[in-house]
Structure formats: structure tokens, C-alpha cells
Design a protein with these regions (language model features):
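Short polar catalytic/cofactor-binding loops
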Residues: 9-14
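Beta-strand segments within the central parallel beta-sheet cores of soluble alpha/beta enzyme folds
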Residues: 6, 41-51, 78-84, 108-112, ...
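Phosphate/pyrophosphate-binding loops at sites that engage ATP/ADP/AMP, CoA/4′-phosphopantetheine
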Residues: 31-45, 179-186
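Conserved catalytic cysteine-centered active-site region
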Residues: 2-5, 17, 54-108, 115-172, ...
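Short, well-ordered amphipathic alpha-helical segments that serve as non-catalytic structural scaffolds
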Residues: 23-38, 64-68, 175-176
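N-terminal extracellular/periplasmic Venus flytrap/periplasmic-binding protein-like
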Residues: 191-210
Length: 210
């Protein structure tokens, strides 16, 4: 089997960045990744671009990767746009690796880009998240999440996606409550996970919380 190596990596700083766009964030990441790999854009033979929310929140659709990568100096090559929810980035990487193993290319680029902070468009953001569920069963899904740990969640906090929260945040909270009830997990144990993560982020100049 062909041995595949990741020659360079990069990411933008984590944060809300209201003035940035998917295109501008992509340009930052691609430029830094090429520099890390020690190659120029001319070496790239194909690219995979993963994203899920840009069509709904920025209006850029159908050719997301082509537009973003052109601004980053990458064009005139095959570009595949990948959308697969939270697995979009890993799916793009897998597809790129498969293409290399098939002997189609030697040097490729994989990009995962997302921007979900639009404070002036809360309803659009909420709708974008709900698009990651079965939209034909929204009421059933809301009820399932609300009832998952109904006896453990105060009544005024029940209801998926209420009070400006993401539907998925409510799902995770319900699952955490259910785990605590089932296995005796404590708040202190969950807090230890957060403390560990914050300890790591203190050493990462690109982390949102330092």
C-alpha cells in the first residue's frame, strides 16, 4: 500500500472573528500550511474542501472550495467539495488519501473551513444547525431530546434549541445528565475534563481561551 505523509499543517486562531469570512480564513490556513510544508501552490495537483454552513450563512453555494481556494492562490486543478456534518474534514482527508493510493496524484491539499458566528442572524444560525438533523422529524427529535433526561433537567431549561442555544448543545447536556444518573458521574469529574482542556489551551497560541 502506498505510504502517505502529511507534509504540512496549519490552522487559524480559534475565535468568533465576526469580520472574517470562510474565504479569508481559508487563505490564512492555506498560506500557512504551504509554508509549513515548504512548497508553493503550484505543487498542488488536487484539493478537497470541506464545509457545512457557508451556503446557509454566507450564501456561497455549489463552488465553495473553488472560490475560497482561488483567493488563496490555488486554482486550475480538480477541487472536490465535501459536506458530511462533523465528519466533513476527516471525510475530505480520507478521500484525498484514497486518490493518492489510487495513483491519481502525489501532492494534494485538504481544507476544512467553517464560520458559525453571526450575531446579527441568530435565526439563520439556528436553522443551519437544525439542518444537521432529519428535518422531517423535527418535532419527534425535539421531544426525544427533551425527554432524554426530563427528570434531571429543570423545567424552565427544557426544550431543544431554546434561549438562543444550539439544539446540539441541549442534546449534549441531556446526555451528560443521563450519564451522571446512570453511572454516577459527578460534576467534579466533568469539570476536570474542562480544566485539563484549559491547561492545554494555555500553551496554544491559537486557542480561543488562554
Amino acid at each position: 500500500m502506498t505510504r502517505i505523509c502529511i507534509a504540512g499543517t496549519a490552522m487559524t486562531a480559534m475565535g468568533k472573528q465576526p469580520a472574517a469570512s470562510v474565504k479569508s480564513l481559508t487563505a490564512q490556513a492555506v498560506s500557512a500550511a504551504l509554508a509549513d510544508a515548504g512548497i508553493d501552490a503550484g505543487r498542488i495537483e488536487a484539493a478537497w474542501f470541506s464545509n457545512t454552513r457557508q451556503p446557509m450563512l454566507e450564501g456561497q453555494n455549489t463552488i465553495r472550495g473553488q472560490i475560497a481556494l482561488r483567493a488563496a492562490g490555488v486554482e486550475g486543478i480538480p477541487v472536490s467539495n465535501v459536506e458530511n456534518a462533523c465528519a466533513s474534514g476527516s471525510t475530505a482527508l480520507w478521500q484525498a488519501a484514497t486518490a493518492i493510493r489510487a495513483g491519481l496524484f502525489e501532492t494534494v491539499l485538504v481544507v476544512g473551513a467553517e464560520k458559525m458566528f453571526f450575531p446579527d442572524r441568530p435565526e439563520a444560525v439556528a436553522a443551519a444547525f437544525m439542518g444537521g438533523t432529519d428535518i422531517h422529524r423535527i418535532d419527534d427529535i425535539h421531544a426525544a431530546v427533551s425527554n432524554l433526561a426530563a427528570g434531571l433537567i429543570p423545567e424552565d431549561l427544557r426544550g431543544a434549541g431554546t434561549a438562543g442555544r444550539s439544539f446540539f448543545m441541549d442534546s449534549y447536556a441531556a446526555l451528560a445528565r443521563l450519564h451522571m444518573q446512570t453511572f454516577g458521574t459527578t460534576q467534579a469529574q466533568l469539570a476536570a475534563v474542562a480544566a485539563k482542556n484549559h491547561d492545554h489551551s494555555a500553551h496554544n497560541p491559537l486557542a480561543q481561551y488562554r
